[in-house]
From Swiss-Prot:
Species per Swiss-Prot/TrEMBL record: Mus musculus
Gene that this polypeptide is encoded by: Ldb1
Tissue: Expressed in multiple adult tissues including heart, brain, liver, kidney, testis, lung and muscle, with expression highest in the pituitary gland and skin.
Any one annotated GO CC term: transcription regulator complex
Lineage, opening ranks: Eukaryota, Metazoa, Chordata, Craniata, Vertebrata
Protein name: LIM domain-binding protein 1
Region (Disordered): 284-330, 367-411
């Protein structure tokens, strides 16, 4: 179906709606060139439908909507399938579109309850092959209104209206449409391979041409056979059986890989894997990271101040008794640097860079405790003059008593 384009600056007469079997503009879809960006100033503008418009100004990405185009390439590669395709063909298909550590998840609901199957990269080729082994002759995916999001190292494609369409030729021509949500994660690199594939199936429909019903309208037995579904929740019995088998095969991938790598017997591989798993279970838990001790800075005392303080203490000890408090240096009782931690915030503490250092400064040349009883050294200070009031000594207690009666008698 063709639709006219009413854009004022668009030179195209019409464009085709997106089809999973052909690119948006037929053969005019630009080839996949990783590392390039469409530019308005370079050549004619490609003919894109509204969902394939070139990237907007300021979008720093090395490609346009390459996620949709990768799905188109996947559908195109699946169309090349023939009955002669072997395991190597399917492995090459998976290598082209899936990462080495890719995970594929299928969720659906059967009569006995919901099911969820997750398989790794090794089992993905056989999954797609089981779809064709179940009678399908064609397989492709249709994405309607997908949402693309950019992350740090991958690009996610979320399509709530995704469909997986298969066509079966036996026992009668039937088209099966499986509807659900398809979520994909593409690695943000040149290869744009899928890392996560999650398909949640909601419902399915099986379509039969009217011409076939008209041919067997008079055959009740044939009509009864046509009324029965050939799939369960859109999946053939071959695919369902393989997914059930993957429940056992997926945990055994470690054994198979060890058997191929070291050429060990299955029993030895099992013993080795169990022993390593036991070691991981009994291994002591990692000790919590200890907090580093607070950094303290020691003040370096100059040589002159040390000598002067030492000399002063020697002279004072020879001339008089010291008080008990003066026998211990103040610096030996209180550390030079005290670290004050910040208050906790939301259950954690700040780091060392947020700690504040409080330094106590001392004058080592002056000892207040020793100067209390040293009156002679204070009075003989050259800073005091001869007539200074500080030079006169206070009267003794006996002199004060003798002066008191005289003063009273005179009164």
């Amino acid at each position: 179906m063709s639709v006219g384009c009413a854009c004022p600056g668009c030179s195209s007469k019409s464009f085709k709606l997106y089809s999973p079997k052909e690119p948006p503009n037929g053969n005019a879809f630009p080839p996949f060139h990783p590392g390039t960006m469409l530019d308005r100033d370079v050549g004619p503008t490609p003919m894109y439908p509204p969902t394939y418009l070139e990237p907007g100004i300021g979008r720093h990405t090395p490609y346009g909507n390459q996620t949709d185009y990768r799905i188109f390439e996947l559908n195109k590669r699946l169309q090349n399938w023939t009955e002669e395709c072997d395991n190597l063909w399917w492995d090459a298909f998976t290598t082209e579109f899936f990462e080495d550590d890719a995970m594929l998840t299928i969720t659906f609901c059967l009569e006995d309850g919901p099911k969820r199957y997750t398989i790794g990269r090794t089992l993905i080729p056989r999954y797609f092959r089981s779809i064709f082994e179940g009678g399908a002759t064609e397989l492709y995916y249709v994405l309607k209104h997908p949402k693309e999001a950019f992350h740090s190292n991958f690009v996610s494609l979320d399509c709530d209206q995704g469909s997986m369409v298969t066509q079966h030729g036996k026992p009668m021509f039937t088209q099966v449409c499986v509807e659900g949500r398809l979520y994909l994660e593409f690695m943000f690199d040149d290869m744009m391979r899928i890392k996560t594939w999650h398909f949640s199936i909601r419902q399915h429909r099986e379509l039969i041409p009217r011409s076939i019903l008209a041919m067997h309208a008079q055959d009740p037995q044939m009509l009864d056979q046509l009324s029965k579904n050939i799939t369960r929740c859109g999946l053939s019995n071959s695919t369902l059986n393989y997914l059930r088998l993957c429940v056992i095969l997926e945990p055994m991938q470690e054994l198979m890989s060890r058997h191929k790598t070291y050429s060990l017997s299955p029993r030895d591989c099992l013993k080795t894997c169990l022993f390593q798993k036991w070691q991981r279970m009994v291994a002591p838990p990692a000790e919590p990271a200890r907090q580093q001790p607070s950094k303290r800075r020691k003040r370096k005392m100059s040589g002159g101040s040390t000598m002067s303080s030492g000399g002063g203490n020697t002279n004072n000890s020879n001339s008089k008794k010291k008080s008990p408090a003066s026998t211990f240096a103040l610096s030996s009782q209180v550390p030079d640097v005290m670290v004050v931690g910040e208050p906790t915030l939301m259950g954690g503490e700040f780091g060392d860079e947020d700690e504040r250092l409080i330094t106590r400064l001392e004058n080592t040349q002056f000892d207040a405790a020793n100067g209390i009883d040293d009156e002679d050294s204070f009075n003989n200070s050259p800073a005091l003059g001869a007539n200074s009031p500080w030079n006169s000594k206070p009267p003794s207690s006996q002199e004060s008593k003798s002066e008191n009666p005289t003063s009273q008698a005179s009164q």
